[in-house]
Amino acid sequence: LACNIALDAVSRVVIEENGRKEIDIKRYAKIEKIPGGTIEDSKVLDGVMFNKDIIHAHMRRRIENPRIMLLDCNLEYKKGESQTNIEMMNEADFTKILQMEEDYIQQICADIIRFKPDLLVTEKGVSDLAQHFLAKANISVIRRLRKTDCLRIARAAGATICSRTDEIKEEDIG
């Protein structure tokens, strides 16, 4: 059984370039141990596996052949880089600042929704407001995924990791 699994894993990660066969197990294969079960339960998965859940209860958990978008930026309002003090004299000032934050989140979500991905994976955080807009657009979201896992997804899905939502192109979707 162990030999069959090893042979199966190696045969899936063989890369042929310029007539040369190359096997890079460290880069293209990962062993994931899940507690419980028996050795007979072991298997080789063709794809990427990670242990993260979607961020909103109303987002889809099972998606066949998803369009995947990968981001390495926050879907939150940018807080000041340094200590920022804002003096608000009345309620209108506070309302104006809240509206600016909401408009910013709405714009970055619109940039994403325009491409109609089924799944959005980001290495950073996602605000509650962004979760709401994306759930309404039927886009499932996974946040705070490790860079290495994002790179594996990019390689498996043929996607590109984007740093800004306003720079996303159709070719970046996997």
Regions found by a protein language model. Name each.
Residues 1-174:
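Extended amphipathic alpha-helical scaffolds
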